[in-house]
């Protein structure tokens, strides 16, 4: 009849619980997180000052797209950047995520350290996160045949066939190609972030 008698041992009394006092609901929550990999470098020969100078020389801020806040950017050269590129599917579609995972493996095979980000956050926020940790290039999977490659400092993007991305990024990171040469060889994406 919607009531239950419940004995509270610590109070040595009985309490009546009615159905009005209890509600059961099912909620779906979307959780997004940010991972942080802490590391400590403590060499004994004074390289800490050199690294500090590298950080100091490479850090700057630029206005966000809305102009209301400042975005932090580490302008590491691709040669010294610990992570060379990030790979994002533009939207959460199975085929884009499959292409992104495959591309990430190909980039690792050619010796480029990369991160893949399949979170559902906006592409602008994902770009800002990678700019903040000094990643020079971002690959956005928005098709199964071609992707956009974004250069961090200019925020310019070019459309590159998926099968050519590993070699193009490897050549950019090894300074065998310049960003200007890549822009002249591939279609520049207008109105890019």
Give the positions of each predicted feature.
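NTP/phosphate- and nucleic-acid-binding module
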Residues: 1-193
């Amino acid at each position: 009849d919607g009531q239950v008698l419940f004995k509270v041992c610590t109070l040595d009394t009985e309490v009546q619980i009615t159905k009005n006092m209890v509600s059961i609901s099912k909620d779906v929550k979307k959780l997004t997180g940010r991972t942080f990999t802490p590391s400590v470098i403590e060499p004994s020969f004074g390289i800490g000052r050199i690294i500090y100078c590298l950080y100091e020389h490479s850090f700057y801020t630029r206005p966000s797209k809305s102009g209301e806040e400042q975005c932090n950017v580490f302008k590491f050269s691709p040669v010294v950047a610990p992570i060379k590129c990030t790979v994002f599917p533009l939207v959460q579609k199975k085929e884009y995520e499959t292409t992104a995972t495959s591309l990430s493996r190909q980039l690792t095979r050619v010796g480029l350290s990369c991160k893949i980000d399949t979170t559902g956050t906006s592409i602008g926020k994902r770009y800002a996160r990678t700019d903040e940790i000094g990643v020079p290039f971002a690959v956005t999977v928005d098709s199964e045949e071609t992707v956009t490659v974004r250069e961090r400092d200019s925020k310019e993007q070019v459309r590159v066939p998926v099968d050519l991305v590993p070699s193009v990024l490897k050549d950019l990171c090894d300074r065998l190609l310049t960003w200007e040469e890549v822009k002249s060889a591939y279609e520049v994406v207008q109105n890019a972030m």
